Amino acid sequence: MGGLKKPKKKYLAGKPKKIWNKQLLLEELQLMGEYGLRNKKELWLARARLKWIVRRARALLSMTAEERAPLEVPFKEKLYKMGFIEDPNVPLDRILSLDVRAILERRLQTLVFRMGLAKSIHHARQLVVHGHVLVAGRRVTSPGFLVPRELEDKITIEQ
């Protein structure tokens, strides 16, 4: 019988090395207010996801054209389906220039607010947490749910 793996935190890749950097603190505070994040862990999770995307794009850029071709198209299509890029034919350099806002814009909480279904970003979070938001007919209670592009227009409010 094997032992259980020690659980790892999923946000460590996005956690800053120097937590008490004043400029970073102000930037994080501004992002938390703009996107209605409850704590910095939510921001760090988004940064970790972005870091994974950038690392993958950088690895693809370092490959030769023959090695890159079969891997590049599915990677770009996945990013397009998730809504992180606006066109599946963008060059890899544009993927490297993504920032954390691209990830935060795809959160269910943000999309509910941007669609005008809630009065404020905090109201959107409350609607999601209390189970009033349906995505393609299914109740989603996680405000951090990353909405794929195909489900974006299937977000509804149930009162």
UniProtKB/Swiss-Prot annotation:
PANTHER family: 30S 40S RIBOSOMAL PROTEIN, 40S RIBOSOMAL PROTEIN S9. Belongs to the universal ribosomal protein uS4 family. Residues 106-158 form the S4 RNA-binding domain. InterPro entries: Ribosomal_uS4, Ribosomal_uS4_arc, Ribosomal_uS4_CS, Ribosomal_uS4_euk/arc, Ribosomal_uS4_N, S4_RNA-bd, S4_RNA-bd_sf. GO terms for cellular component: small ribosomal subunit. SUPFAM superfamilies: Alpha-L RNA-binding motif. One of the primary rRNA binding proteins, it binds directly to 16S rRNA where it nucleates assembly of the body of the 30S subunit. With S5 and S12 plays an important role in translational accuracy. Keywords: Ribonucleoprotein, Ribosomal protein, RNA-binding, rRNA-binding. GO terms for molecular function: rRNA binding; structural constituent of ribosome. It comes from Pyrobaculum calidifontis (strain DSM 21063 / JCM 11548 / VA1). Gene3D superfamilies: RNA-binding S4 domain. The keyword rRNA processing does not apply. This is Small ribosomal subunit protein uS4. The keyword Transferase does not apply. GO terms for biological process: ribosomal small subunit biogenesis; translation. It holds the Pfam family S4. Part of the 30S ribosomal subunit. Contacts protein S5. The interaction surface between S4 and S5 is involved in control of translational fidelity.
